[in-house]
Swiss-Prot record:
The keyword Phosphoprotein does not apply. PANTHER family: MITOCHONDRIAL 28S RIBOSOMAL PROTEIN S6, SMALL RIBOSOMAL SUBUNIT PROTEIN BS6M. SUPFAM superfamilies: Ribosomal protein S6. Binds together with bS18 to 16S ribosomal RNA. It comes from Shewanella oneidensis (strain ATCC 700550 / JCM 31522 / CIP 106686 / LMG 19005 / NCIMB 14063 / MR-1). The keyword Cell cycle does not apply. GO terms for biological process: translation. This is Small ribosomal subunit protein bS6. Keywords: Ribonucleoprotein, Ribosomal protein, RNA-binding, rRNA-binding. GO terms for molecular function: small ribosomal subunit rRNA binding; structural constituent of ribosome. GO terms for cellular component: cytosolic small ribosomal subunit. Residues 104-122 have a biased composition (Basic and acidic residues).
Length: 131
């Protein structure tokens, strides 16, 4: 079996369908005795240029090990799914399991925010002190 990196972009209005799509695609890979080495849901991101008058899309990255026939089935599923705006399947030399630069940047941003989530750590402390 070969290793592949798969990225697909979903229409932003169909973002709620993404978990089901991921489950369906990963299910097809595991049924064919393939392995999922990395799965990252990057969420909605700004596009570099408009696609079908859209400026954002929901991105998903997968690194898998699967038979070529399964990858062909996935590409066909992408082609006939109107919610998938673009997809890219690349063969890689080996399994990539480390976090992508996009995921690392997101983790870094989240760690800088502190335990309060979206608000800064100082704002959360100021509210607690005021109470």
């Amino acid at each position: 079996m070969r290793h592949y990196e798969i990225v697909f972009m979903v229409h932003p209005d169909q973002s709620e369908q993404v978990p089901g799509m991921i489950e369906r695609y990963t299910g097809a890979i595991t049924e064919a005795n393939g392995k999922i080495h990395r799965l990252e849901d990057w969420g909605r991101r700004q596009l570099a240029y408009p696609i079908q008058d859209l400026h954002k899309a929901h991105y998903v990255l997968m690194n898998v090990e699967a038979p070529a026939e399964t990858i062909e089935e996935l590409e066909t599923a992408f082609r006939f799914n109107d919610a998938v705006l673009r997809n890219m399947v690349m063969r890689t030399k080996g399994a990539i399991t480390e976090a992508s630069p996009m995921a690392k940047a997101k983790d870094e941003r989240d760690s800088r925010r502190g335990p309060a989530g979206d608000r800064s750590y100082d704002e959360a402390n100021a509210e607690e002190i005021a109470e």
